[in-house]
Each structure stands twice: as structure tokens, then as C-alpha cells.
Amino acid sequence: MIDALRRHIYLEEEFLFPPLRAAGLVAPLFVMVREHGRLWRTLESLQLTLSGSTVSPSALHLCHELAVQLQHHNSKEERILYPQADRVLPPSANAQLRAFLDCGQMPEGWVCHGARS
């Protein structure tokens, strides 16, 4: 699950956000990148916590925190980002997205923009 969420963030930030930014969708993307940073840091904490031999109460807390973050984040994506993407993405961007979904891999060591120092 952690890797799938990271891959989802990569896909959005590298393939979806650039054409949306070029179309003038700046403020919503700023919010999305900031939220991606929070999600990324929660994923890192969760992965570190789960690397032990037992599941600690902090892991359960992090899972709950992640679920809440995702609920808020996804509602914005569904209402704002994805409808705009349907309107402004050129066919070439759609083709890149589909190709990545089919077999693309996130580059080793990639970190989302909102979690970079």
C-alpha cells in the first residue's frame, strides 16, 4: 500500500500537475503538493514503524492519521483536480499517464516536491 500511494503521488506530480500548472491551475496545485508532503511524511513514519517485528500503537495511530489525510485530500482531487484534468490535458499527456499506469516505475530515490528539504 505504501509503495502504491507513493507511485500515485509520483504520477500526479510528474505527469498530471505540469500541464495543469501550464493551464493556470496554480493555487489548487500548491495545496495538493503541500498535502502530498504531509502524506509522504506520514508514509515514511508508517513504514519505519512497520519495519519492526511487532505492530505498535503508534502504527495504528499513523494508519488512522493517513486515512484521515487521504479522505480530505481525495475529496479535493475528485472535486477540483480531476475535472480540470479532463478539460485541459492534451492527448499526449493522457498517453503518458496511460503508459506509466501500464508499466511505469517511479525512479529510485524520488521524493515528492512537498517533502523535499
Predicted segment positions?
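Small-residue-biased structural context
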Residues: 1-117
